[in-house]
A protein has these predicted regions:
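Flexible, charged surface loops at secondary-structure boundaries
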Residues: 1, 75-78, 222-225
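N-terminal glycine-rich anion-binding loop in soluble enzyme alpha/beta folds
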Residues: 2-64, 70
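Mixed-charge interfacial surface used for oligomerization/domain docking
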Residues: 10-20, 24-26, 30-31, 37, ...
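Alpha-helix initiation and N-capping motif
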Residues: 47-48, 68, 129, 142
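Active-site cofactor/cluster-binding pocket
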Residues: 66-101, 105
Length: 280
């Protein structure tokens, strides 16, 4: 039986190391429109160029989800298919994958497909994809993998730290006043993905040092107890180094994986931003 683990580019992995036997990982890209340019969020994307252009334009940039046809093409050739999408509150990717599933199963009734709305982005999506690969490698049946990943998802969370909010302001999700204050006062926005998949603000911290402490405090408050952490970041090695030290002071054996953000996650996290998935 051939497996496919499929994720849209709300996941930061472009490829997966140590793939389970008879398993393929496929990234289905969203597109991001900046001014007149449309960027496809795949392995060839020059994220630095996209971000530079995004900050140079005064108009709102926007993303577009994969089409059902994009998903159907990614399903081809597998018996067992599991899809993970960015939260449905930010994108139509989940709905697109569900439509593709319905059509594909009519044409391939012996295939098995499960679509997961991560209710999240970045690091937490990465955690789910990583766990799926481990579950398949254990030799579990399709239904067992679905049950296990559903249970696992209930024990993962997303914490985000934003140093810039230009996109949120341009898209009308934050007022210009707040955007100006964040820039002038060196404010970091610390928040989480809620249980319904919305991004909620938890704290405003002034400066990197206070943001690191705020992020760690929120992790502990949410029930973190030394489990795996995946941090997707947009050019903020210093934060990761100091935050990792703080985590390992309390949890010496904590496993921390660090990834650069995908194009889509760079679009949301912006320069210096982080999207951190962790187990509770």
């Amino acid at each position: 039986m051939k497996w496919k683990i499929i994720a849209d580019s709300g996941c930061d992995y472009r490829s997966l190391d140590n793939l389970a036997p008879d398993t393929e990982f496929v990234s289905v890209p969203l597109t991001i429109q900046v001014g007149e340019t449309i960027y496809r969020d795949d392995a060839q994307l020059n994220i630095d160029q996209m971000m530079e252009e995004m900050y140079a334009t005064t108009t709102a940039s926007k993303s577009a989800c994969p089409s059902p046809d994009d998903y159907m093409k990614s399903f081809e050739g597998a018996d067992n298919i599991i899809v993970v999408t960015i939260t449905g509150t930010l994108s139509g990717s989940y709905n697109s994958a569900e439509i593709a599933k319905k059509i594909y199963l009519e044409e391939h009734p012996n295939a098995k497909i499960h679509v997961i709305d991560s209710l999240s982005a970045g690091g937490e999506v990465d955690l789910l994809v990583r766990k799926l690969n481990h579950l398949v490698a254990e030799g579990l049946e399709f239904d067992q993998v679905v049950d296990a990943i559903t249970t696992y998802q209930s024990k993962t969370k997303l914490l985000f730290v934003l140093a810039k909010v230009d996109n949120l302001v341009k898209n009308g999700r934050l007022s210009k006043l707040i955007g100006t204050v964040v820039g002038l006062l060196n404010i970091r926005m610390v928040g989480e993905a809620s249980k319904t998949g919305t991004l909620e603000l938890l704290q405003k911290a002034r400066g990197q040092k206070k943001a690191i402490k705020a992020a760690f405090d929120e992790l502990i408050k949410a029930g973190y107890n030394g489990g795996h952490i995946t941090i997707a970041h947009r050019n903020n090695d210093k934060f990761i180094e100091q935050f990792s030290e703080l985590v390992r002071e309390k949890f010496a054996n904590a496993s921390i994986e660090v990834l650069p953000t995908s194009g889509l996650c760079s679009f949301y996290a912006e320069e210096g931003g982080l999207l951190m998935g962790y187990e509770i």
